From Swiss-Prot:
Mg(2+) 2 binds at residues 173, 175, 236. Residues 1-98 are annotated as: N-domain. This is Flap endonuclease 1. Interacts with PCNA. PCNA stimulates the nuclease activity without altering cleavage specificity. Structure-specific nuclease with 5'-flap endonuclease and 5'-3' exonuclease activities involved in DNA replication and repair. During DNA replication, cleaves the 5'-overhanging flap structure that is generated by displacement synthesis when DNA polymerase encounters the 5'-end of a downstream Okazaki fragment. Binds the unpaired 3'-DNA end and kinks the DNA to facilitate 5' cleavage specificity. Cleaves one nucleotide into the double-stranded DNA from the junction in flap DNA, leaving a nick for ligation. Also involved in the base excision repair (BER) pathway. Keywords: DNA damage, DNA repair, DNA replication, Endonuclease, Exonuclease, Hydrolase, Magnesium, Metal-binding, Nuclease. Belongs to the XPG/RAD2 endonuclease family. FEN1 subfamily. Binds 2 magnesium ions per subunit. They probably participate in the reaction catalyzed by the enzyme. May bind an additional third magnesium ion after substrate binding.
Length: 338
């Protein structure tokens, strides 16, 4: 998903403790998709309530977000609006990949291949309107604000860092850097020992922070030139140029200065080039208000335990931590006022 700039970027290992006191914008669709993929039962299936409704996203939002709050990190979830029209081909390709994985899953089920069943199941996820609406309901009950983007969520989330209202964007996607995010936090909600898809092996995944200005300075380029590099390698809005990865694209842009010179000299065709550059430089965004409210503890129990069969003892244990954190934060605000 998105642009792959990993090979040319400086990344620093970080932790929740390192980011204590921060307000962060969360690329909601990106993170919810991660929850749906990773929070699953032993059979590889997503968590479900007694009515068969998927609840992996609710588990992720409640427990992982509570962990952020416990570390004095305040999240503002940002939800996607209408996709940019040039994203249609990417969405179509993702749909085809899911269809192929569904066919492979059916074959794995027929042959009782448990390893393949678990691996393929984790790749077949859909963020439905119900999943989005229930995510927003839970955030409201937790007293957490969310922002509705007019288009791409990572663009809105990145804009919020440019305004100085949040410290970083929580997302797996490097696209945020093209949209101007000052900092992105990767592996911030799902970390630790993680299983490698399709195998029994695990790797240790650590949170990392990527600073835009540090990387631009290190690479000796501007943000617009970083966008050029992204376009050459491929984004959600264009397929990229065959044979050009991030390192080659960087070399070309540093040699020829801009993408127009590159495509002319190399005889490359890129459709909708000006429109893509403009969208990354000046994406649409909505006005917003960031206001944190007192959690509705009874409402959370009714919603998670009453409606979705969460363990009441585990939910209450987490709510006690949220309550302590809220009271501590509220008292700190009063102390600053007086």
């Amino acid at each position: 998903m998105g642009v792959n700039l990993s090979s040319i970027l400086i990344k620093h290992e970080t932790s929740l403790k390192d980011n204590s006191g921060s307000i962060v914008s969360v690329d909601a669709y990106n993170i919810i998709y991660q929850f749906l993929s990773s929070i699953r039962g032993d059979d590889g299936e997503p968590l479900k309530d007694s009515n068969g409704n998927i609840t992996s996203h609710l588990s992720g939002i409640f427990y992982r977000t509570s962990n952020l709050l416990e570390n004095n990190i305040k999240p503002v979830y940002v939800f996607d609006g209408k996709p940019f029209h040039l994203k249609s081909e990417t969405l179509r390709e993702r749909s085809l990949i899911k269809e192929k994985n569904i066919m492979k899953l059916e074959e794995a089920i027929a042959s009782n291949d448990d390893a393949k069943i678990r691996s393929l199941s984790s790749r077949i996820n859909y963020i439905t309107d119900d999943i989005v609406n229930e995510s927003k309901t839970l955030l409201n009950l937790m007293g957490l604000p969310y922002v509705q983007a007019p288009s791409e969520g990572e663009a809105q989330a990145s804009y919020m860092t440019l305004k100085g209202d949040v410290n970083a964007v929580v997302s797996q996607d490097y696209d945020c850097l093209l949209f101007g995010a000052k900092r992105i936090l990767r592996n911030f909600t799902v970390y630790g020992r993680r299983r490698i898809a399709g195998t029994s092996r695990t790797i240790n995944v650590n949170p990392e922070i990527i600073d835009l200005n540090e990387n631009l300075s290190n690479l000796g380029i501007s943000r617009e030139q970083l966008i050029y590099i992204g376009i050459l390698t491929g984004t959600d809005f264009n397929p990229g140029v065959k044979g050009i990865g991030a390192k080659t694209a960087l070399s070309l842009i540093k040699k020829y200065n801009d993408i127009y010179s590159v495509i002319k000299i190399k005889n490359i065709g890129i459709d909708n080039l000006d429109e893509i550059i403009e969208f990354f430089m000046n994406p649409p965004h909505n006005d917003y208000e960031i206001k944190f409210n007192e959690p509705d503890f009874d409402g959370i129990i009714d919603f998670l335990c009453g409606k979705h069969n969460f363990s009441e003892s585990r939910v209450n244990e987490t709510l006690e931590k949220i309550s302590r954190n809220y009271k501590k934060d509220h008292q700190s605000s009063l102390d600053r006022f007086f």
